[in-house]
Design a protein with these regions (language model features):
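Transmembrane-helix signature of polytopic, membrane-embedded enzymes
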Residues: 119-144, 163
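Membrane-interface transmembrane helices that cradle and orient dolichyl/undecaprenyl
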Residues: 160-184, 220
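Membrane-interface alpha helices of multi-pass inner-membrane proteins
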Residues: 182-199
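Intrinsically disordered, polar/acidic, low-complexity terminal segments
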Residues: 4, 8-131, 221-233, 247-333, ...
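Transmembrane alpha-helix segments characteristic
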Residues: 135, 327-358, 407-414
Length: 586
């Protein structure tokens, strides 16, 4: 059956969309194996503990109080809808590593769907919008974004910034169709919320204008449609400037109140530094850039990686092959430039920041968190380039006989990108995610629950070993207000040889079914010999395993363990070398 006949079937386009969404989600969800990164290591713990220990009514009142603090200009930055600085009900999604990542992925996919919808609407081609839907999941730098960047960090900050901008874009096009002012009002409000979430929102007026131009085919009409969105931005800008002015007055002692430190987001007009940081930030938004510069190998490839690659790439190539009517050159140029604006404009804001102009903050493979939404712009640019190549190839005499080969090569390249990123992400981060999970399970099961005022040191370093973060971890998982320290930091300090300290650690086995956590009482700056040792074997550990450990007199002990399906706590007698505790197959 010819391709044209297949694409005309009623089931073809719904099937392409379903395959793309299902396997695109599966592909991007690989980073649920990675540990938390950046400020999430502290903020997630604090906010989840807060929401689970506060009544619903009080949490609503606290949220309204935080909003009032923002709208009354008591903070140096006007970000009332930002996440995670403002406490809110979304804190319920911060407690579980996998659940948190899936929550952010839901935001990301909502943006993907809205971007595709907006492209399809602006180009007056639903098929082009579906092609955009299929391409976008492959545009993210999954390996590099897995921990410390916002595709999977910072409470979906940039995703929740982009979403109202996309709604504003759809609203102005609807206003053009109907003439109803309510759509203009909606666009204005959405841009207000966008800019009041994160400052990169101010740049989205540019792609909105570009897509409005694509829709109307006239720059003048596009300017008219952009006015409501621009007014929404102006309102936010007024609040933002007001907040900075009030903060300056408080810093000068003219007004009472605390002063916010906002030097890192105040612009620095050092042109060479701006251009260098701008270029580096833009480069980080391209999907394979970090892996190529980092010479990252894929590691072990599983059949599921190949399946995801084949299905995601297959859906994208099928959508491109079925494009029977391509945008003209002007429309395609506007689509490309709109994508370029989504890449370059947020990156320019980062380039203006004195904080990120400093060496080491941004490089050719690592950008700040806006790089995630820059990837949406890369997707629009890639779509425009592919459309241009399709138009060129379809005009050649060799196209009818060679198109199958070219589509196959394109599919192989796309699938290879997906397989490479997915396998590399698992290889790079799987052990970190396993360590975080089993360590948290052990604390939740009661390890160190009886420590009292005795200090606790942890083998797993939270937020660089910061004591506030270490304490927050025990509060979150064990409801325990512990005097917690990172073992690496503890060993650099002076401690008496007889100073008692509990050590909580973990040992990773051959796979997650052999991961364990343990706790014991040691002494001094190097608590390597422990007594009163408890070992936690979490749910999911294989039955009939063997626990190995070595005593202080170098005797290796082999102990068979029989596990409960909900997890098992085992007590060991004598003096035991902490680093010798491990679980293995029978």
């Amino acid at each position: 059956m010819k391709l044209q006949k297949i694409t005309q079937k009623r089931w073809f386009w719904p099937l392409v969309c379903a395959v793309s969404v299902v396997f695109g989600w599966w592909y991007l969800s690989i980073v649920t194996c990675a540990p938390l990164g950046g400020d999430d290591e502290l903020i997630n713990l604090q906010n989840y503990y807060y929401i689970t220990h506060t009544s619903f009514g009080q949490s609503v009142l606290d949220y309204l109080g935080d909003l009032w603090e923002q709208f009354s200009l008591q903070n140096g930055r006007f970000r009332p809808f930002s996440s995670p600085p403002v406490r809110g009900l979304t804190s319920w999604f911060l407690g579980d590593l996998v659940g948190y990542r899936l929550y952010i992925l839901a935001w990301t996919y909502a943006d993907i769907v809205l971007t595709a919808w907006l492209v399809g609407k602006a180009s007056r081609s639903k098929k082009l919008g579906i092609a955009c839907l299929c391409l976008l999941p492959m545009m993210f730098s999954v390996w590099q974004d897995s921990t410390g960047n916002s595709l999977y960090s910072y409470g979906a900050l940039v995703q929740s910034t982009l979403l109202p901008a996309l709604v504003a874009g759809l609203a102005v096009l609807r206003w053009q169709d109907t003439g109803h002012k309510r759509w203009a009002v909606l666009a204005g409000y959405c841009m207000f919320q966008c800019c009041a979430t994160f400052e990169i929102g101010f740049t989205y007026i540019v792609p909105i204008f570009g897509l409005a131009w694509l829709y109307t085919d006239k720059a003048r009409d596009a300017l008219r449609l952009s006015i409501p969105a621009l007014l929404g931005e102006c309102v936010t800008l007024a609040f933002n400037m007001g907040a900075r002015l009030m903060n300056t007055l408080r810093a000068a002692g003219i007004l009472a109140g605390s002063v916010s430190q906002i030097e890192g987001i105040s612009p620095n007009f050092d042109l060479p530094a701006i251009l260098r940081t701008w270029a580096m930030q833009m480069s980080a938004g391209f999907p394979l850039n970090a892996m190529l510069f980092g010479k990252m190998r894929p590691g072990k490839i599983y059949p599921v990686d190949v399946l995801c690659g084949v299905m995601v790439a297959g859906a994208a190539v099928a959508a491109l092959a079925a494009l029977d009517k391509l945008p003209n050159k002007k429309q395609n140029l506007l689509l490309f430039l709109s994508g370029l604006a989504m890449v370059s404009a947020p990156a320019l804001l980062i380039g203006l920041s004195p904080k990120y102009q400093q060496p080491g903050q941004v490089d050719w493979r690592h950008g700040y968190i806006p790089q995630t939404v820059e990837s949406f712009g890369v997707g629009l640019m890639a779509l425009a380039v592919l459309v241009m190549l399709l138009r060129w190839a379809r005009g050649k005499s060799w196209w009818p006989g060679g198109r199958a080969v070219l589509y196959g090569l394109l599919a192989v390249c796309m699938a290879g990108s997906v397989v490479w990123q997915r396998a590399a992400t698992r290889s790079a981060y799987d052990q970190g995610g396993r360590a975080y999970t089993v360590f948290g399970d052990g604390v939740a099961a009661g390890l160190a629950a009886d420590c009292g005022d005795t200090p606790v040191v942890t083998d797993y370093m939270i937020w660089g070993g910061h004591e506030v973060a270490e304490n927050a971890f025990f509060l979150r998982y064990g409801d325990l207000d512990a005097d917690a320290h990172a073992l690496q930091v503890w060993r650099t300090e002076d401690h008496a040889d007889d100073e008692a300290v509990y050590r909580v650690g973990f040992t990773l086995g051959q796979d997650r079914h052999y991961d364990i956590a343990w706790c014991g009482l040691g002494h001094g700056a190097d608590p390597d010999v422990l007594t009163d040792v408890e070992v936690w074997l979490p749910a999911g550990t294989f039955l009939y395993d063997v626990l190995y450990y070595t005593t202080a007199d170098d005797e290796e002990v082999r102990r068979e363990v029989y596990l409960d399906k909900n997890g098992t706590m085992i007590t060991l007698d004598g003096e035991i070398l902490a680093d010798s505790i491990r679980l293995a197959a029978h």
